[in-house]
Amino acid sequence: IRLFDDDVFLQHNAFRAPGAPSIEELRDAPKKIDYLKGIYSKMHKGITTHPAIDANNVGLLDGITFAFLCIDAGEGKRAVIEKVDALGVSIIDVGMGLELVDGSLGGILRVTMSTPSNRAQARERISYIGGGEKDVYSSSIQVADLNALNAVLAVIKWKKLIGFYRDLEGEQHSTYTTDGNMLLNGDGE
């Protein structure tokens, strides 16, 4: 398991991270990947951490067999996706767009699977452009429930991919909209 992230683990991260960090852990302000490695290494062996992934070090992905991606939009994300495409590796990319209107949040969660057989469709769905100045998510707003739901939807999609869950639809792209509680699937087989 390879973890990539250059963020520092601060109080706003604690609300959406597994477990409950101590005040001492928060004061130490470790890298987020080091905090998560400490938790997950109690259950898994072979976890390695890297502070960042971008066009300069995508070779760190050599040898992977699958990837979950939750990367800020930009050229670094494009380089990672091009690398996993070249490796022939399936990925699941998640994203979230939020807006604040009249003091109330609304938004859409996205889960997109890219396999060697659907690269073109997936590339149309994966965003490389950030939310700009209206991007509420970048303000560290606390939406742990939406982060968790997006992660769970990604894991369910992966379990369908490996045959654990039945997948009659074969959807490769799903969105969840908070207003109306709508879960929509697209790009099926």
Model-derived regions, located:
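Long, low-complexity, intrinsically disordered polar/charged segments
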Residues: R2, N13-I23, I53-L69
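Glycine-rich phosphate-binding loop and adjoining beta1-alpha1-beta2 segment
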Residues: R2-H44
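Electropositive phosphate-/nucleotide-binding environments in soluble metabolic enzymes
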Residues: P30, D34, D145-L153
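E1/E1-like adenylate-forming module used to activate ubiquitin-like modifiers
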Residues: H44-P51, V58-N150, K160, T177-E189
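Oxidoreductase and adenylate-handling cofactor-binding alpha/beta cores
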Residues: V152-R166
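Core catalytic loop region at the nicotinamide-binding pocket of NAD(P)H-dependent oxidoreductases
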Residues: Y165-T177
